Amino acid sequence: MLYKGDTLYLDWLEDGIAELVFDAPGSVNKLDTATVASLGQALEVLEKQHDLKGLLLRSNKAAFIVGADITEFLSLFLVPEEQLSQWLHFANSVFNRLEDLPVPTLAAVNGYALGGGCECVLATDYRLATPDLRIGLPETKLGIMPGFGGSVRLPRMLGADSALEIIAAGKDVGAEHALKIGLVDGVVKQEKLIEGAIAVLRQAITGDLDWRAKRQPKLEPLKLSKIEAAMSFTIAKGMVAQTAGKHYPAPMTAVKTIEAAARFGREEALNLENKSFVPLAHTNEARALVGIFLNDQYVKGKAKKLTKDIETPKQAAVLGAGIMGGGIAYQSAWKGVPVIMKDINDKSLNLGMTEAAKLLNKQLERGKIDGLKLAGVISTIHPTLDYAGFDRVDVVVEAVVENPKVKKAVLAETEQKVRPETVLASNTSTIPIGELASALERPENFCGMHFFNPVHRMPLVEIIRGEKSSDETIAKVVAWASKMGKTPIVVNNCPGFFVNRVLFPYFAGFSQLLRDGADFRKVDKVMEKQFGWPMGPAYLLDVVGIDTAHHAQAVMAAGFPQRMQKEYRDAIDALFDASRFGQKNGLGFWRYKEDSKGKPKKEEDAAVDDLLASVSQTKRDFSDDEIIARMMIPMINEVVRCLEEGIIASPAEADMALVYGLGFPPFHGGAFRWLDTQGSAKYLDMAQQYQHLGPLYEVPEGLRDKTRHNEPYYPPVEPARPVGSLKTA
């Protein structure tokens, strides 16, 4: 053994070839600060071996290196800019030493090589991959850019266009594509990986392969003519401006850095990467996006822990077909859980099967599946008008019309047709779980399972714990949701549960703005372009359905009369009374017509202004800041109340539910991350300016306490250790 660290070791393999093996404790390798330092120490040993002829890098895990240790990011990003810059210089000196070894080097890459893992293998001369490889640089999705030389080496290896596509979009690619663009030099079966790697190294050692020529372009300026450079970078900047926009600075910074570094050799190019990375790491956007990643891991980990002793359902059923039922059936079947889809008429069943077939055909058109796979999946969805097969079902979700009498009757009837241990769930969005459970003989086997539309796209499923729901029931439904590829978040029962409960105060803020003379078009524009929502409130109401919102608004007002009962006729009432139900009937705040792809396209409709004039004061202009404050304060206050009342268990789960269920702008990180970034004192000052507007704008006492004690909602993070100690970790 030449060297042994905590996460890697170095040893002789054969005939002058050494192997450097990443083998961290636990299931995966991460390129954390300690591993970077350990890699430096291993290279120090290696540089002294006079009989060294070649070096093989490999992993003892199912994945090569999954990336940097993102749990370290928040503390690293608090280190002063100069110290963070110094540490990056140190880390890059380690990868440069790997790249500068006087012998050929090869990385045998299996599974994942992402982020820092990808940057590590870019420093070797050759890369041999297994067919299951996913390799790429996802840093821009975390609000940063490659910091270990990825923005320097990748363009010099692949050319500007391919590298820009991967870096700016934060993409990873499979083995076949990586081979095609030159990111790897060969693809071999896992069992042949080491043998193949040694064979390539031997060819390089004997001179049959010119490893020096392979290395040289990575050390030099990017080989691009002025015209080629102008075209590549102009197109890339245009695409990034269009897709990322101003709220996500990392992709544009990465493109501009690669452009500026193109005319320099490695050292100067790395300096430019360093100068761009450090300011990005100190942005609120980076902290928010890293926070989302960590919250996602927390939520998924909690679901995994909850279901560790639970068998995933093997057979499911959906009550009620149509678009929603068909979407749920598709998602279950697509992820490998056969499903019975029951309805009371053929027309609805046909609609449900058509929806599932349409979604599968889209997968076929995109080349994700072949005809055989399509036929296999669709055959696991069994449409029926009766209860045949329900005695074999492990879990049933009811998705019939949003009417308590109908739902209770359907659930009670179904309970008689299934085994005693079968779990029943309701996809209700507003009806209290306790009310539905009252119709059942086994309420402990019942809970809420709230999907979001469209089911195949929306990641969140709210699992609602009723007063009598057993832990096992919750765990079984969480297991099914996880198997479906969804992110399940368990909430306690209340009107609207969590997501709808916090959404309707936001809509109430919108209604008050319109009542006071705001133009809905400007409100939408500000909330989309300035705050960052994917849709403004008017457009969102049209998509949800004005009739659906009108009904839900009444339910919420009955549930929370003190805050959500209104004493005036609002825009939702006016549109509902005029039978303008949104996209579903082509008339809402906008008029809708199908575009060339058959998707609804919104158009101005002057008739709306006349309708809204009856429920609003004279038009007046509101500043962007005032619109944002009046829209967001009711939502934020309600989110805080939900945490205080135990409806949602943690800030992390609340923020992920908002991001995954409502499209809360990820660069804000969620309501609690946004609050912590603003500071509760600043938020309180802002909210108090609007408390005259009514109870929705009154800040909860718990948030006032946070302000008095200067406490954040997320645990405080300490800056990482001084950079000098990182070097010798």
Curated annotation (Swiss-Prot):
Substrate binds at D296, N500, Y660. InterPro entries: 3-OHacyl-CoA_DH_CS, 3-OHacyl-CoA_DH_NAD-bd, 3HC_DH_C, 6-PGluconate_DH-like_C_sf, ClpP/crotonase-like_dom_sf, Enoyl-CoA_hyd/isom_CS, Enoyl-CoA_hydra/iso, FA_oxidation_alpha_subunit. One of its GO terms (biological process) is fatty acid beta-oxidation. Residues 707-729 are annotated as: Disordered. The keyword Cytoplasm does not apply. In the N-terminal section; belongs to the enoyl-CoA hydratase/isomerase family. This is Fatty acid oxidation complex subunit alpha. The lineage of its organism: Bacteria, Pseudomonadati, Pseudomonadota, Gammaproteobacteria, Enterobacterales. The gene is fadB.
